[in-house]
Amino acid sequence: MYTFVVRQENSSVYAEVSRLLLATGYWKRLRRDNPRFNLMLGGRNRLPFGRLGHEPGLAQLVNYYRGADKLCRKASLVKLVKTSPELSESCSWFPESYVIHPTNLKTPVAPAQNGIQLPVSNSRTDEREFFLASYNRKKEDGEGNVWIAKSSAGAKGEGILISSEASELLDFIDNQGQVHVIQKYLEHPLLLEPGHRKFDIRSWVLVDHQYNIYLYREGVLRTASEPYHVDNFQDKTCHLTNHCIQKEYSKNYGKYEEGNEMFFEEFNQYLTSALNITLENSILLQIKHIIRSCLMSVEPAISTKHLPYQSFQLLGFDFMVDEELKVWLIEVNGAPACAQKLYAELCQGIVDIAISSVFPPPDTEQVPQQPAAFMKL
């Protein structure tokens, strides 16, 4: 009998995983504060990583990788792309981005070289001067100069401003309470017809305890309800495909797709009929390359191969596609939700790939086969 604890009660994904484990008959759920467990299904914040793996004779597995925030926080992802040797020279799939600290965040900077302590001010990682230089250069060259400011830890479309005015973007950030990223806005996205609408793509990725990378074969397009207009920054519903924004602000929510979601089979049919291309060859090849590049760049920092406990993690990679069919990584979610119709298959894959490979069913010596719903990258 294996045992597990649940320390994240509000995760629909891990609620389903918990249900699947109990249904096997060889997993038992313990009280959340019991230290002698095989598996912890916890929240990604404040996990007790330092206390894991120290129970004598007990293998322990947790559903997050310590340090995965290098990918999953927007500012950290920008820094990773710029500083990682694997990414900095060859990364053409991430929009031009800058980390900006509000001026009201009082963070000491490093001492000057002459030993004089500089006054308390912006963090030393602030990149607003680099942003302004790029902004002014684009303005002089007559290039598209629309940018988007996003809170590093924001979600559900909160803490976002789209503008072509640098001063407006910086003033917006300076009145916030946390770090933001200013990112070049994708002004010419591939649009869906009918409706001339934006979309983004969510792909789910599972990393197991041996750092094998699995891509869930199904993905979902989150679609806008209103026609896209690059110069109308006030209408969030034509720019931001987040479900919360679409559902709350658009009278056309659900008009084109149920729940503003289009799945890969329908998207492939659309690409074939409208553009005479396939999803696999035009878009998925790029998605796979980006996912693998990101995860391999952080492996040395987050792998648990030499630690007394083991980890796995489900990640949500969000992409956009421009009118030239180039795929761009927008962000990585460390605790992704899942489309309702996909829960059963996705969560069964988590059990089979990430959990049963460490704690195999007691009535067989064979490790379960990789579910067909996932592909190993």
Swiss-Prot record:
Necessary cofactors: Mg(2+); K(+)
InterPro entries per UniProt: TTL/TTLL_fam (IPR004344), Tubulin-tyrosine_ligase (IPR052492)
EC number: 6.3.2.25
Class of this enzyme: ligase
Catalytic activity entry: C-terminal L-alpha-aminoacyl-L-glutamyl-L-glutamyl-[tubulin] + L-tyrosine + ATP = C-terminal L-alpha-aminoacyl-L-glutamyl-L-glutamyl-L-tyrosyl-[tubulin] + ADP + phosphate + H(+)
Pfam families: TTL (PF03133)
Subunit structure: Monomer.
Functional summary from the UniProt entry: Catalyzes the post-translational addition of a tyrosine to the C-terminal end of detyrosinated alpha-tubulin.
Family statement: Belongs to the tubulin--tyrosine ligase family.
Protein name from the UniProt record: Tubulin--tyrosine ligase
